[in-house]
């Protein structure tokens, strides 16, 4: 654009010869530029990352299953000749039971096996099995020709009992349980301390408590504490509901209890939680009709497993109930249930803590007075306080708001605590606990 004198203000190249030609970067310059901005250990980190990628690639090649839609290895890794030879050499085995070992101390011991519904045989061991692996009463796998013992088998356990084992840990921790600080401390003394610090009990010469009874009104956090224990401990956790052990046929419930403890003894450390134990643990009586005889047999088997002739081993037992007054005295005695923990109604501090626990996962205002709300919920259980938080969220959704206000909580208190008081069974259960 020209200025006031008419000269053009745009810059022009006066001399094309002064421009230097563009020179391409060589490999040395590129390597130098790559070093800019790198830390001291960048080269070592890069080398380790490359090694990890190579190992992952090698693992995927060896497995050849994860990246395949059919679940098969790549055809390049197939060995059909070896697979065919394996199928011809390995024949299906038959399940039998070793009833007696003859001349066990000799170099060539003999074993009496019982093939179910067929016959009994005196057999030898195959070359793959050591004599120390076979015991009397054990299930074994034998071939169909010479009936030689090829493999020891684990004890037979009902699949219903196996399904009671908790594989995935619950997502509940001790910080998610409010109003039960004293109860959690007592529970951890029984469950965690013997597993983590057994030398303390050995030095004192005492055996740690092995059984705990959790009792209290409904909704006070008994099952919630058991879920927190399952999350905390690394031991095997088995969950049993009392009504699952009530079976139709005679002896089925007692057999399930027996197999349950057999499976627990195979673990290094085990924790069994019986929920609603009053379903099978009621006091024994004779009604004249014999309707509860099977339930009483199941309870007697449970009593025998807890503290009978055979030692229990490293098995901790938790039991929860709303009606401790109905339990049999033989089940309640020390040695079977050493500690009784009462879960009473939470106090003001506990109710405030429970409100904060449930509100921290909600979108709420910052200046909500939780202590005031806790004062408006006297004699309330933790389940009722959780229902208050849920109803407060429902009031906010009904008003098409994204956050819950203190007014929503006040309306929820009026609805849950005051309007639903006629449905509450807490006063009646308080007379039983």
UniProtKB/Swiss-Prot annotation:
Residues 1-22 are annotated as: Disordered. InterPro entries: 26S_Proteasome_ATPase (IPR050221), AAA+_ATPase (IPR003593), AAA_lid_3 (IPR041569), ATPase_AAA_core (IPR003959), ATPase_AAA_CS (IPR003960), NA-bd_OB-fold (IPR012340), P-loop_NTPase (IPR027417), PRS7-like_OB (IPR048723). Residues 8-22 have a biased composition (Basic and acidic residues). GO terms for cellular component: nucleus; P-body; proteasome accessory complex; proteasome complex. Transmembrane segments: none annotated. The modification N6-acetyllysine is found at residues 116, 422. ATP binds at residues 216-223. Its main location: cytoplasm. Keywords: Acetylation, ATP-binding, Cytoplasm, Nucleotide-binding, Nucleus, Phosphoprotein, Proteasome, Ubl conjugation. The keyword Acetylation applies. Monoubiquitinated by RNF181. One of its GO terms (biological process) is ubiquitin-dependent protein catabolic process. GO terms for molecular function: ATP binding; ATP hydrolysis activity; proteasome-activating activity. It is found in: Cytoplasm; Nucleus. Belongs to the AAA ATPase family. Component of the 26S proteasome, a multiprotein complex involved in the ATP-dependent degradation of ubiquitinated proteins. This complex plays a key role in the maintenance of protein homeostasis by removing misfolded or damaged proteins, which could impair cellular functions, and by removing proteins whose functions are no longer required. Therefore, the proteasome participates in numerous cellular processes, including cell cycle progression, apoptosis, or DNA damage repair. Component of the 19S proteasome regulatory particle complex. The 26S proteasome consists of a 20S core particle (CP) and two 19S regulatory subunits (RP). The regulatory particle is made of a lid composed of 9 subunits, a base containing 6 ATPases including PSMC2 and few additional components. Interacts with NDC80/HEC; this interaction is detected only during M phase. Interacts and SQSTM1. Interacts with PAAF1. Directly interacts with TRIM5. This is 26S proteasome regulatory subunit 7.
């Amino acid at each position: 654009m020209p200025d006031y004198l008419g000269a053009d203000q745009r810059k022009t190249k006066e001399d094309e010869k002064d421009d230097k030609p563009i020179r391409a970067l060589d490999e040395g310059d590129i390597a130098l530029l790559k070093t800019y901005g790198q830390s001291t250990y960048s080269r070592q980190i890069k080398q380790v990352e490359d090694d990890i990628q190579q190992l992952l690639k090698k693992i995927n090649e060896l497995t050849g299953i994860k990246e395949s839609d059919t679940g098969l290895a790549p055809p390049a890794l197939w060995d059909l000749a070896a697979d065919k030879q394996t199928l011809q050499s390995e024949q299906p085995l038959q399940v039998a039971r070793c009833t007696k070992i003859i001349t066990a101390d000799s170099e060539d011991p003999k074993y009496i096996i019982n093939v179910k519904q067929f016959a009994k045989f005196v057999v030898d061991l195959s070359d793959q099995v050591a004599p120390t692996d076979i015991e009397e009463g054990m299930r074994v796998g034998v071939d169909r020709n010479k009936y030689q013992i090829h493999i020891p088998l684990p004890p037979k356990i009902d699949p219903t009992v196996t399904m009671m084992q908790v594989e995935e840990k619950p997502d509940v921790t001790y910080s998610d349980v409010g109003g039960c600080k004293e109860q959690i401390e007592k529970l951890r003394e029984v469950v965690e301390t013997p597993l983590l610090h057994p030398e303390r009990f050995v030095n004192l010469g005492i055996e740690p408590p092995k059984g705990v009874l959790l009792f209290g009104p409904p909704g006070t956090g008994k099952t919630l504490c058991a879920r927190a224990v399952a999350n905390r401990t690394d031991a095997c956790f088995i969950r049993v509901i009392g009504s699952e052990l009530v079976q139709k046929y005679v002896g089925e419930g007692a057999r399930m209890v027996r197999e349950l403890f057999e499976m627990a003894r195979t673990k290094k450390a085990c924790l069994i939680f019986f929920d609603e134990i009053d379903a099978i643990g009621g006091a024994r009586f004779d009604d004249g009709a014999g309707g509860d005889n099977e339930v009483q047999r199941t309870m007697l088997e449970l009593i025998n497993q807890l503290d009978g002739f055979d030692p229990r081993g490293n098995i901790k037992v938790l039991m929860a109930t709303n009606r401790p007054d109905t339990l049999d005295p033989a089940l309640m005695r020390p040695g079977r249930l050493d500690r009784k923990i009462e879960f009473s109604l939470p106090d003001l501090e506990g109710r405030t803590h429970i409100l904060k626990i449930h509100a921290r996962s909600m979108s709420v205002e910052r200046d909500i007075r939780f202590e005031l709300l806790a004062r408006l919920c006297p004699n309330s259980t933790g389940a009722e306080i959780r229902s208050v938080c849920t109803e407060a969220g429902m009031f906010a959704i009904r008003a098409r708001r994204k956050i819950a206000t203190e007014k929503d909580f006040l309306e929820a208190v009026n609805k849950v605590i005051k309007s639903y008081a006629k449905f509450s069974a807490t006063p009646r259960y308080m007379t039983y606990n």
